[in-house]
A protein has these predicted regions:
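Glycine-rich, basic loop-to-helix element that forms the pyrophosphate-binding segment
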Residues: 67-83
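Short, well-formed alpha-helical segments that are part of the catalytic scaffolds
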Residues: 14-28
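Conserved donor NDP-sugar-binding/catalytic core segment of glycosyltransferases
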Residues: 100-137
Length: 309
């Protein structure tokens, strides 16, 4: 069987109650050269039965993999290893897309001249909410060729976006699985941005759904912050070591990242862990020390919040 153009990848943990709308949205895509890879990260609900039933009825390949719970970082790495497509699209377990989303992605990708394509990692477009409003900022032009760091820190473009990446590139940038707890995707996107460009377009490609349980999980508690503390320290140190030059362009944003290293290092200390992942460069340490008072203040605020709650 020929390899598909797209691998649609969905990581899932006890999301059987939302996966049906993902399946229906994927099944409605007008562009059909794709496979769907579902990595079940230790679910205890009926995800396996649901996906198995869909695999028997669907007219596109569905491949299901179950693994012990290891957070999205391990599920993402597994999806990248198992994928067969040239282009890799991470489709979360509770979102939908317009029926022409894959067609838009395909057309915008092949609009990049073939001779230039190796310099790009993929294509990213806009998201709308359930009411149809654009989530975040539009791009100044469409297409707009840039990268994650330049678009956010350089041009101040923010908000929810969605896109695919070349599988060959993702295989060179795996998530670090030795980190305990969650690891933010920004760690990987920033690393890729140092080497590759992204084509950004003002096409709507995703419908963003807010679930009641996602609102609950988004509430910050000390316990939750300590669960992400190591990943936050690791990502902040990587940024300070590799991307410190952005301080001249976006001093407030970079200072916040530097302060977060101190903040979450103290959360690690309070949880009894010795790992800190400090910066490895002079510039990284200089920025950390510059923002140290803010980081301490943020940590103290977290602690006071836990007392109040």
């Amino acid at each position: 069987m020929a390899a598909p153009l797209f691998t649609i990848f969905t990581p899932s943990y006890n999301r059987a109650h939302t996966l049906s709308r993902v399946y229906e949205s994927i099944a409605a895509q007008t562009f059909r050269d794709f496979e769907w890879v579902v990595v079940d990260d230790g679910s205890t609900d009926n995800t396996a039965e649901l996906v198995g039933a869909w695999a028997r009825e669907a007219d596109f390949p569905i491949r299901y993999f179950h693994q012990p719970n290891g957070h999205k970082k391990t599920a993402f790495n597994r999806g990248v290893r198992e994928a067969r497509g040239e282009l890799f699209l991470c489709w979360d377990s509770d979102d939908t897309a317009p029926s022409d989303a894959l067609q838009i992605f395909r057309d915008r990708w092949f609009a990049i001249p073939k001779v230039d394509r190796d310099a790009y990692v993929g294509v990213t477009g806009l998201c709308i909410d359930e009411a149809g409003a654009i989530v975040g900022d539009r791009y100044p032009t469409s297409p707009y060729d840039s990268d994650t760091l330049s678009s956010t820190l350089g041009d101040g473009i923010g908000g929810e976006k969605w896109g695919f990446q070349r599988l060959a590139v993702l295989r060179d940038f795996p998530f670090p699985e030795f980190i305990q707890g969650l690891v933010g995707e920004g760690l990987i996107w920033n690393a890729i941005a140092r080497k590759y460009r992204t084509r950004y377009v003002n096409d709507v490609v995703r419908i963003y759904h807010v679930e009641p349980d996602s609102l609950i999980h988004s509430q910050k508690t000390v316990a939750k912050m300590r669960g992400v503390a190591e990943g936050q320290c690791y990502a902040a140190a990587a940024f300070l070591d590799h991307d410190w030059r952005w301080f001249a362009k976006a001093p407030v944003d970079v200072a916040k990242i530097a302060a977060n290293h101190t903040r979450f290092a103290w959360h690690l200390r309070r949880s009894g862990r010795s790992v800190r992942h400090p910066p490895q460069t002079f510039a990284g340490w200089a920025l950390k020390l510059l923002a140290w008072p803010v980081g301490i203040a943020a940590f103290a605020y977290d602690e006071l919040g836990s007392v109040r709650s």
